[in-house]
Amino acid sequence: KETILENIKRATTLNVNQLISKIRNFQHQTTLPLTLENFISLNHISIETIYKKDSWSRLCQKAGVIDDFEQINEKQIYSAIGKKWLSTNSTSYFNFILQIAKQNFNIRISDFSENEKTMLLMVHYDVWQNAGDFDSLEKSINQIGKNKTLVKEIIEVLEILIDKIGFKEIDIELPYEQPLKLHARYTRDQILVAFRMSTFEKRSSNAIGVGVAENKEINTEILFIDLIKSEEDYSPTTLYDDYAISETLFHWQSQNQTRDDSGKGLTYINHKKLGKKILLFVREQSTNEFKNTNGYVFVGEGNFQEHEGSKPM
C-alpha cells in the first residue's frame, strides 16, 4: 500500500524538467506515436499533472519533439483546459466544443440553435474569462481557432475527457431552455451563463464565491453547495451546514441574513406557489487534490419540505 501511495505521489509531483525528459524518452520506450493519450497512459500520469505545468504542445516543443509554434491565444487556451475543462464533466458540452474545434472554431452564429448559442457563450467565458472584448460572439469563437497547434491539442484533450466519463447525463424539464444536464459537472461561470445571469456584454456579479444566484426573469434560483467546507475558504458565519439526509432529501442552510417571515425566506417556503425553480449544484469541496477549483454536479430541482430557525433558516 505504501509503495502504491509513494508511486502516486511521485507521479503527481513531477516537475517540468522531469516531464520534458519523459517526453524525450517516449520514443525509446514504445513504438506507439507520441500523443497526449499515449503519453499519460504509458507513464501512468494524470492529465491534471500535465496541465499543472504547461500545455502539452509547449512541453513537446521544449522537449524538442515538435517545432516551435506561435503564442497567439496560448495563455488563454492553456488556462481554459487546465482551469475550466478539467473541472467540467459533461458529455454533451464536451461533444459540442469538439464539434466546433473540428471546424477550427470557424463558425457562423446563424447556424446554431438558442441552446447552442448559450454553449458558445459558455466557451467564450471558458477561454476569455470575461465579457465583451470582441464585436460579437461569433468573432470571439473564431479567434480561438487562430492557433492551429492548440486547436489540435483541444481536440485531443476533449477526446480523452469524453472517453473518461462513466455516467449518463439526463435532461431536466424546466419552463425554459438551457443546455445543462443532470449528473454532469460544470464550473460556476458555465452555470451563470446557462441560466442567463452572465451575458456576452456583462459577466454576472455572482461569478465569485456567493452561495446563491437568482435570475428573477426566469424565476430561478441556483444554490451552489460545498459539502466539505474548510475554515480557510469560509468565515465562521458562512460555514453553513449542508448535507444529504437520503437520496432524495437534502439539508441546506440559508444565508445568514435570510429570515423565515419575509423576503427571500418566504420565497423558499412558497416557491411552488410562486412557480419559482430552485436548482441544486453540489460539489465535494472547493478544490481537488491538484489544487484546481472543483466544478459543481447538477443534482436537480429542489422542492421545499420543511424548515426551522431564522437568520439562517
Tell what function each PLM region has:
Residues 69-221, 230, 239-248:
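C-terminal accessory/interaction regions of large nucleic acid-associated machines
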Residues 217-232, 278-283:
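Short, hydrophobic/proline-enriched secondary-structure or compact coil segments at domain edges
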Residues 261-268, 301-303:
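Polybasic, proline/glycine-rich intrinsically disordered low-complexity segments
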Residues 223-225, 241, 264-266:
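Charged, low-complexity helical/coil segments in non-catalytic cytosolic or luminal regions
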Residues 287-313:
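Compact mixed alphabeta submodule
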Residues 246-251, 255-258:
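Short, contiguous, well-structured surface segments enriched in hydrophobic/aromatic residues
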Residues 265-287:
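Short coil-to-beta transition motif at edge beta-strands of beta-rich domains
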Residues 2-104:
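Long, largely alpha-helical accessory region at the distal end of helicase-like NTP-driven motors
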